[in-house]
Protein backbone atom coordinates (compact mmCIF):
# COMPACT_ATOMS: atom_id res chain seq x y z
CA UNK A 1 0.00 0.00 0.00
CA UNK A 2 1.12 3.35 -0.68
CA UNK A 3 1.71 6.00 1.82
CA UNK A 4 -1.24 7.94 0.60
CA UNK A 5 -3.53 5.02 1.30
CA UNK A 6 -2.11 4.62 4.81
CA UNK A 7 -2.64 8.31 5.49
CA UNK A 8 -6.20 8.10 4.15
CA UNK A 9 -6.96 5.01 6.28
CA UNK A 10 -5.57 6.75 9.39
CA UNK A 11 -7.56 9.90 8.63
CA UNK A 12 -10.70 7.85 8.00
CA UNK A 13 -10.16 5.99 11.29
CA UNK A 14 -9.70 9.29 13.13
CA UNK A 15 -12.84 10.67 11.47
CA UNK A 16 -14.86 7.58 12.53
CA UNK A 17 -13.47 7.84 16.09
CA UNK A 18 -14.31 11.55 16.14
CA UNK A 19 -17.81 10.77 14.88
CA UNK A 20 -18.37 8.27 17.71
CA UNK A 21 -17.00 10.78 20.24
CA UNK A 22 -19.33 13.52 18.94
CA UNK A 23 -22.27 11.08 18.97
CA UNK A 24 -21.53 10.14 22.60
CA UNK A 25 -21.17 13.81 23.57
CA UNK A 26 -24.44 14.60 21.76
CA UNK A 27 -26.29 11.87 23.70
CA UNK A 28 -24.82 13.14 26.96
CA UNK A 29 -25.83 16.72 26.18
CA UNK A 30 -29.33 15.58 25.15
CA UNK A 31 -29.79 13.78 28.50
CA UNK A 32 -28.53 16.85 30.33
CA UNK A 33 -30.96 19.05 28.37
CA UNK A 34 -33.86 16.70 29.21
CA UNK A 35 -32.97 16.86 32.92
CA UNK A 36 -32.75 20.67 32.74
CA UNK A 37 -36.15 20.81 30.99
CA UNK A 38 -37.67 18.59 33.70
CA UNK A 39 -36.23 20.84 36.42
CA UNK A 40 -37.50 23.96 34.63
CA UNK A 41 -40.95 22.40 34.23
CA UNK A 42 -41.03 21.55 37.96
CA UNK A 43 -39.94 25.06 38.84
CA UNK A 44 -42.63 26.54 36.57
CA UNK A 45 -45.25 24.37 38.29
CA UNK A 46 -43.97 25.54 41.68
CA UNK A 47 -44.04 29.18 40.57
CA UNK A 48 -47.63 28.81 39.32
CA UNK A 49 -48.68 27.14 42.57
CA UNK A 50 -47.01 29.86 44.66
CA UNK A 51 -48.66 32.60 42.58
CA UNK A 52 -52.05 30.96 43.17
CA UNK A 53 -51.36 30.70 46.91
CA UNK A 54 -50.31 34.35 46.99
CA UNK A 55 -53.52 35.34 45.20
CA UNK A 56 -55.61 33.34 47.70
CA UNK A 57 -53.69 34.84 50.63
CA UNK A 58 -54.17 38.38 49.32
CA UNK A 59 -57.88 37.75 48.74
CA UNK A 60 -58.25 36.41 52.28
CA UNK A 61 -56.30 39.34 53.68
CA UNK A 62 -58.63 41.77 51.88
CA UNK A 63 -61.71 39.94 53.18
CA UNK A 64 -60.26 39.84 56.70
CA UNK A 65 -59.52 43.55 56.58
CA UNK A 66 -63.07 44.32 55.47
CA UNK A 67 -64.44 42.06 58.21
CA UNK A 68 -62.25 43.79 60.79
CA UNK A 69 -63.50 47.19 59.66
CA UNK A 70 -67.10 45.97 59.95
CA UNK A 71 -66.44 44.49 63.41
CA UNK A 72 -64.76 47.69 64.56
CA UNK A 73 -67.81 49.63 63.37
CA UNK A 74 -70.13 47.23 65.20
CA UNK A 75 -68.02 47.57 68.34
CA UNK A 76 -68.10 51.35 68.05
CA UNK A 77 -71.88 51.30 67.59
CA UNK A 78 -72.28 48.97 70.57
CA UNK A 79 -70.10 51.25 72.68
CA UNK A 80 -72.24 54.23 71.65
CA UNK A 81 -75.43 52.34 72.55
CA UNK A 82 -73.93 51.28 75.88
CA UNK A 83 -72.90 54.85 76.66
CA UNK A 84 -76.41 56.04 75.77
CA UNK A 85 -77.90 53.37 78.06
CA UNK A 86 -75.60 54.45 80.88
CA UNK A 87 -76.63 58.07 80.37
CA UNK A 88 -80.30 57.04 80.44
CA UNK A 89 -79.82 55.01 83.63
CA UNK A 90 -77.93 57.86 85.26
CA UNK A 91 -80.61 60.33 84.22
CA UNK A 92 -83.37 58.05 85.53
CA UNK A 93 -81.50 57.50 88.79
CA UNK A 94 -81.20 61.24 89.24
CA UNK A 95 -84.84 61.90 88.31
CA UNK A 96 -86.74 59.05 89.96
CA UNK A 97 -86.44 58.10 93.64
CA UNK A 98 -88.34 54.78 93.21
CA UNK A 99 -86.07 53.73 90.37
CA UNK A 100 -83.01 54.67 92.45
CA UNK A 101 -84.23 52.43 95.33
CA UNK A 102 -85.01 49.55 92.95
CA UNK A 103 -81.62 49.86 91.20
CA UNK A 104 -79.71 49.83 94.49
CA UNK A 105 -81.69 46.98 96.11
CA UNK A 106 -80.30 43.45 96.41
CA UNK A 107 -81.76 40.77 94.16
CA UNK A 108 -84.29 38.42 95.75
CA UNK A 109 -82.90 35.07 96.96
CA UNK A 110 -84.76 33.11 94.26
CA UNK A 111 -83.14 35.21 91.52
CA UNK A 112 -79.73 35.04 93.17
CA UNK A 113 -79.96 31.21 93.34
CA UNK A 114 -80.59 31.08 89.56
CA UNK A 115 -77.14 32.55 89.04
CA UNK A 116 -75.37 30.13 91.39
CA UNK A 117 -74.22 26.74 90.19
CA UNK A 118 -73.68 23.95 92.71
CA UNK A 119 -70.45 21.98 92.47
CA UNK A 120 -70.59 18.60 90.73
CA UNK A 121 -68.52 15.59 91.82
CA UNK A 122 -68.92 13.85 88.46
CA UNK A 123 -70.95 14.15 85.28
CA UNK A 124 -73.76 11.86 86.41
CA UNK A 125 -74.45 14.04 89.48
CA UNK A 126 -74.99 17.20 87.45
CA UNK A 127 -78.20 17.83 85.54
CA UNK A 128 -77.92 19.16 82.02
CA UNK A 129 -76.89 22.79 82.37
CA UNK A 130 -77.38 25.67 80.05
CA UNK A 131 -74.29 27.61 79.02
CA UNK A 132 -73.92 30.97 80.68
CA UNK A 133 -74.22 32.69 77.31
CA UNK A 134 -77.77 31.34 76.77
CA UNK A 135 -80.73 32.92 78.58
CA UNK A 136 -82.62 30.95 81.21
CA UNK A 137 -85.92 29.48 80.00
CA UNK A 138 -89.13 31.15 81.14
CA UNK A 139 -90.28 29.35 84.31
CA UNK A 140 -93.92 29.98 83.44
CA UNK A 141 -93.76 27.85 80.28
UniProtKB/Swiss-Prot annotation:
GO terms for cellular component: host cell plasma membrane; membrane. One of its GO terms (biological process) is killing of cells of another organism. Residues 119-141 are annotated as: Disordered. It is found in: Host cell inner membrane. InterPro entries: Phage_P2_LysB (IPR020000). Residues 18-141 are periplasmic. It is a single-pass type II membrane protein. The chain crosses the membrane at residues 1-17. Its main location: host cell. Keywords: Coiled coil, Cytolysis, Host cell inner membrane, Host cell lysis by virus, Host cell membrane, Host membrane, Membrane, Signal-anchor, Transmembrane, Transmembrane helix, Viral release from host cell. Interacts (via C-terminus) with the spanin outer lipoprotein subunit (via C-terminus). Part of the spanin complex which spans the entire periplasmic space. The spanin complex is composed of spanin inner membrane subunit and spanin outer membrane subunit. Component of the spanin complex that disrupts the host outer membrane and participates in cell lysis during virus exit. The spanin complex conducts the final step in host lysis by disrupting the outer membrane after holin and endolysin action have permeabilized the inner membrane and degraded the host peptidoglycans. Host outer membrane disruption is possibly due to local fusion between the inner and outer membrane performed by the spanin complex. This is Probable spanin, inner membrane subunit.
